[in-house]
């Protein structure tokens, strides 16, 4: 009986492996769309969209440490302004087709749109009195990119 059970398990595994080869949804989760009616495609796409939703990124925050480990260390809280505003900030700061970033425009957009939610920075002149402008600029850019990618938690 024990051998019989093992044979059955082996046979079931072989059947399962054969089914996986025949069923293209097993590995990708996407059925063969060419075999679906338009109505079935739309129903599948609607379900797929529902299942792929993420938590709203708007207002998500991240605390950053600037000049960490030095006597000039301070913390800032960044808040995601939403996809449209974050995208506009980045677009306005992108100088050419190669994707070079104008950090003055990036940081001005971040200040103007409340991306730096604490402390309340009103002007780039804040960094006349605090070290770490370029460090903050890089962290702001990474934060906006993470939000645009839907990766903020």
Residue ranges and their predicted role:
Residues 49-67:
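Short acidic, Pro/Gly- and aromatic-enriched capping/linker segments at domain boundaries
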Residues 17-24, 32-38, 42-44, 56, ...:
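Short, surface-exposed, charged amphipathic helix/loop patches that serve as local interaction elements
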């Amino acid at each position: 009986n024990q051998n019989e059970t093992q044979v059955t398990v082996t046979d079931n595994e072989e059947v399962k492996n054969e089914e996986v080869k025949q069923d293209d949804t097993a590995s990708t989760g996407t059925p063969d769309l060419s075999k679906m009616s338009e109505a079935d495609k739309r129903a599948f796409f609607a379900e797929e969209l529902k299942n792929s939703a993420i938590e709203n990124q708007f207002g998500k925050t991240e605390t950053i440490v600037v000049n960490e480990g030095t006597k000039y260390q301070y913390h800032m809280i960044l808040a995601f302004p939403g996809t449209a505003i974050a995208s506009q900030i980045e677009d306005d700061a992108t100088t050419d087709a190669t994707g070079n970033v104008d950090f003055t425009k990036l940081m001005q957009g971040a200040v103007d749109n409340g991306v730096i939610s604490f402390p309340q920075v009103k002007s780039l002149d804040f960094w006349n009195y605090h070290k770490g402008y370029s460090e903050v600029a890089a962290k702001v850019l990474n934060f906006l990119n993470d939000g645009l990618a839907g990766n903020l938690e």
